[in-house]
Curated annotation (Swiss-Prot):
GO terms for biological process: ribosomal small subunit biogenesis; translation. InterPro entries: Ribosomal_uS4, Ribosomal_uS4_arc, Ribosomal_uS4_CS, Ribosomal_uS4_euk/arc, Ribosomal_uS4_N, S4_RNA-bd, S4_RNA-bd_sf. This is Small ribosomal subunit protein uS4. One of the primary rRNA binding proteins, it binds directly to 16S rRNA where it nucleates assembly of the body of the 30S subunit. With S5 and S12 plays an important role in translational accuracy. Residues 174-205 have a biased composition (Low complexity). Belongs to the universal ribosomal protein uS4 family. Pfam families: S4 (PF01479). Transmembrane segments: none annotated. Residues 173-205 are annotated as: Disordered. The gene is rps4. The keyword RNA-binding applies. GO terms for molecular function: rRNA binding; structural constituent of ribosome.
């Protein structure tokens, strides 16, 4: 039993602090998906391990055969596949075996921050996070400020800029006009002034 009032950690931290291959992979994911730290990587990696562990156990039981059609093992396998399909992590024709081939990237691609960037609501993955945190993004008309929210497949078309936000796709894609250079335009006149002064007749004393 945990301490009352204290939330339980939802992810497992690495067992060994100094593993170059793992550190390089985590750093690459942080940069690729614009994360603030590695906690999101560890959380999604923990979720993936649970999915794969459950799938592996169910495949072991189901491979033995002789299971009735209403067996809870079959229902559990169907529920895992259906859940991952609903999240858009697995394709519609996927099977339980496909869960074993999933990577952390597959879950990262379903984050709200990633989808906002992929759909062109932001010019960069970091800008997508900024828009979400500052309340410029809505899901089905409601403001959403959680970059790590896993977007359902059915919710992708419900994403938009929040009503009242000054940001639009037109403004985002518009290129700023180059600033005029009045000094450069005045340069020829300034250069011509000494020549005109030299050509002017001198007054007799």
């Amino acid at each position: 039993m945990g301490y009352p009032g204290q939330a339980k950690k939802l992810y497992d931290t690495p067992n060994h602090p100094w593993q170059k291959a793992r550190i390089d992979e985590e750093t690459s994911l942080v940069k690729k998906y614009g994360l603030r730290n590695k906690k999101s990587v560890w959380k999604h990696a923990s979720d993936l391990r649970k999915y794969r562990s459950n799938a592996r156990a169910l495949l072991g039981v189901m491979s033995a055969g002789n299971l009735p059609e209403d067996s809870h093992y079959i229902r559990d396998a169907q529920n895992i596949v259906k859940k991952l399909q609903t999240l858009g992590i697995l394709k519609e024709d996927a099977k339980l075996e496909d869960v074993l081939a999933l990577k952390v990237d597959d879950i990262m691609e379903r984050r709200l921050q990633t989808i906002i960037y992929r759909k062109g609501f932001a010019n960069s993955i970091k800008q997508a996070r900024q828009f979400i945190v500052h309340g410029h993004i809505s899901l089905n008309g409601r403001k959403i400020t959680v970059p790590g929210y896993l977007v359902l497949k059915s919710e992708e078309d419900m994403l938009s800029y929040y009503v009242g936000s000054p940001i639009t796709k037109e403004k985002l894609m518009a290129k700023p006009q180059p600033a005029s250079a009045p000094k450069a335009a005045a340069a020829p006149k300034a250069a011509a002034a000494p020549a005109e002064a030299a050509a002017a007749p001198k007054k007799e004393e």
